[in-house]
Amino acid sequence: MARNRQPVLKKCRALGIDPVILGVKKSSNRQIRPNANKKPTEYATQLREKQKAKFIYNVMEKQFRKIYEEAARKLGVTGLTLIEYLERRLENVVYRLGFAKTRRQARQIVSHGHIAVNGRRVNIASFRVKVGDIVSVIENSKNVELIKLAVEDATPPAWLELDRAAFSGKVLQNPTKDDLDFDLNESLIVEFYSR
């Protein structure tokens, strides 16, 4: 399986992302890149926005393109549907519910089989949850220290409901752009793929 092993701070600096979004509590001491004062081309801004979304959601190009194409086929605004599909991925829902401190940690928790959806264990990070689904930590994993610590600080968005005592959460509605925890201009991504 292909993985992005690039240093997080280096990539954050290149894309103009605050590392806190990714759960990294460090900051880079490096100066601004030499060509940072140049006005980027239209293509460069579109590419950067796409790369930012891919990096934050930890999705490779092939999978990201498939998600985009699926969103483009659906009726409605393509960019908002794309955001909805990315937010409804199981690894992201686990992170947003507060079972993990970062999206990367959430991906590992899912792939190690600590999460169940509607009572059935799911270990596929790209699994897409639906409205009404109940995402929970399996019984054996409720005393894993990482999950316990993460749930204490959890503040889920409005589209999710968290039950701290039961280590479970419910999807109340589909996420919208307002529910994002970072700035994303989805129209630039749509323009990039519709060239």
Curated annotation (Swiss-Prot):
Job description of the protein: One of the primary rRNA binding proteins, it binds directly to 16S rRNA where it nucleates assembly of the body of the 30S subunit.
Matches recorded under Pfam families: Ribosomal_S4 (PF00163), S4 (PF01479)
Biological processes per GO annotation: ribosomal small subunit biogenesis; translation
Domain S4 RNA-binding positions: 88-150
Family: Belongs to the universal ribosomal protein uS4 family.
Subunit structure: Part of the 30S ribosomal subunit. Contacts protein S5. The interaction surface between S4 and S5 is involved in control of translational fidelity.
Protein name (record): Small ribosomal subunit protein uS4
Protein source organism: Fusobacterium nucleatum subsp. nucleatum (strain ATCC 25586 / DSM 15643 / BCRC 10681 / CIP 101130 / JCM 8532 / KCTC 2640 / LMG 13131 / VPI 4355)
InterPro entries according to UniProt: Ribosomal_uS4, Ribosomal_uS4_bac-type, Ribosomal_uS4_CS, Ribosomal_uS4_N, S4_RNA-bd, S4_RNA-bd_sf
